[in-house]
Amino acid sequence: MPQLNTTVWPTIITSMLLTLFLLMQLKTLNMYYHPPASPKLMNIKPHNNPWEHKWTKIYSLHSLPLQS
């Protein structure tokens, strides 16, 4: 039975690893990697909400008295 002959195993394993390594190199070299995106400056306008100016601590839920 030839599979029990272990004298050729290192040669087969080495050739298999070398072949897989070369195939992976060829596969990854054919891929196109996009360059990283450059940051874009955006003009952000502050939102004017009508409740921002009149919201005070009096209306906050944590400052209201406890109700039983």
Curated annotation (Swiss-Prot):
One Gene Ontology biological process: proton motive force-driven ATP synthesis
Organism: Symphalangus syndactylus
Keyword flag Transport: yes
Cellular compartments annotated: Mitochondrion membrane
Modified residues (N6-succinyllysine): 54
UniProt modified residues of type N6-acetyllysine: 54, 57
GO molecular function: proton transmembrane transporter activity
Cellular component per GO, a single term: mitochondrial membrane
Record-linked InterPro entries: ATP8_mammal (IPR039017), ATP8_metazoa (IPR001421)
UniProt key word Cytoplasm: no
Main location: mitochondrion
Lineage: superkingdom: Eukaryota
Pfam families, per the entry: ATP-synt_8 (PF00895)
Key words of the record: Acetylation, ATP synthesis, CF(0), Hydrogen ion transport, Ion transport, Membrane, Mitochondrion, Transmembrane, Transmembrane helix, Transport
Protein encoded by which gene: MT-ATP8
Subunit structure: Component of the ATP synthase complex composed at least of ATP5F1A/subunit alpha, ATP5F1B/subunit beta, ATP5MC1/subunit c (homooctomer), MT-ATP6/subunit a, MT-ATP8/subunit 8, ATP5ME/subunit e, ATP5MF/subunit f, ATP5MG/subunit g, ATP5MK/subunit k, ATP5MJ/subunit j, ATP5F1C/subunit gamma, ATP5F1D/subunit delta, ATP5F1E/subunit epsilon, ATP5PF/subunit F6, ATP5PB/subunit b, ATP5PD/subunit d, ATP5PO/subunit OSCP.
Lineage: Eukaryota, Metazoa, Chordata, Craniata, Vertebrata
Protein name per its UniProtKB record: ATP synthase F(0) complex subunit 8
